[in-house]
Amino acid sequence: MSSLLEKTRQLNKILQKSGAEPVVFDDICNLLSEVLSCNVYIISKKGKILGYDLSTGFECQTVRDKVVPEKRFPEHYNNKLLNVHGTKSNLENQGECVFESGEDCGVKNKLTTIVPINGNRERLGTLLLARFDVPFTDDDLIISEYSATIIGLEILRSKQDEIEEEARKKAVVQLAIGTLSYSELEAVEHIFNELDGPEGLLVASKIADKVGITRSVIVNALRKFESAGVIESRSLGMKGTHIKILNDRLLEELKKIK
């Protein structure tokens, strides 16, 4: 498929899909790489690689050995990308490595195109395209900028999903805490002080003696939390009970009560 219309229709399929379910950024990269015959990176505002595709088979060793495994571009390079406020196409590396200052680039004839990803009047990230020998055309840039718009919408939606998920987890924890009696709440505070992390071993009898409450109070408190889905517990017999926190908002909400 070579025409601009046909390429746009391919991207529209992703946009239509995004109305019903989240788009995986790697899917966008795979399609863009196929449509534009180039390497593609979607980079967050903080430099994290949200998705990429190197299906052209060509890329410098630094990218393959450092950038891709770490899923992050160097801070100084990401800052340069963020300082680009409009599309810049067919940038040449001038024989120098853009990641390692003072180092020569072993890849020749590499052309880079930078497309800012914006949404809600803020910079959300960068769409980075790399090709060898063949310059990006105006049609390629139209496709790239259109793709950046799609990606921007997806980043905004994923941010909103994160906000909603955090609110849900917080509400679940608050409801679980609300079901505890005063003595159960006191027991819970001591339990997670003893735990000292997201999971660990608890000996209920030791805490009961230390706090001056019955063992049944501790057991009831743990059952309520487990029913709410905020923890997972497993009896290890005489050794005690292994507890794992499933809701990462739990410790934070307990701290607010103190």
UniProtKB/Swiss-Prot annotation:
One of its GO terms (biological process) is negative regulation of DNA-templated transcription. Signal peptide: none annotated. The keyword Kinase does not apply. One of its GO terms (cellular component) is cytoplasm. Residues 1-156 are annotated as: GAF domain. Keywords: Cytoplasm, DNA-binding, Repressor, Transcription, Transcription regulation. Residues 204-223 bind DNA. It comes from the Bacteria. Gene3D superfamilies: 3.30.450.40, Winged helix-like DNA-binding domain superfamily/Winged helix DNA-binding domain (1.10.10.10). InterPro entries: CodY (IPR014154), GAF-like_dom_sf (IPR029016), GTP_trans_reg_CodY_C (IPR013198), Transc_reg_CodY_N (IPR010312), WH-like_DNA-bd_sf (IPR036388), WH_DNA-bd_sf (IPR036390). It is found in: Cytoplasm. The keyword Cytoplasm applies. One of its GO terms (molecular function) is DNA-binding transcription factor activity. Its main location: cytoplasm. DNA-binding global transcriptional regulator which is involved in the adaptive response to starvation and acts by directly or indirectly controlling the expression of numerous genes in response to nutrient availability. During rapid exponential growth, CodY is highly active and represses genes whose products allow adaptation to nutrient depletion. NCBIfam families: codY_Gpos, PRK04158.1. Belongs to the CodY family. This is Global transcriptional regulator CodY. The gene is codY.
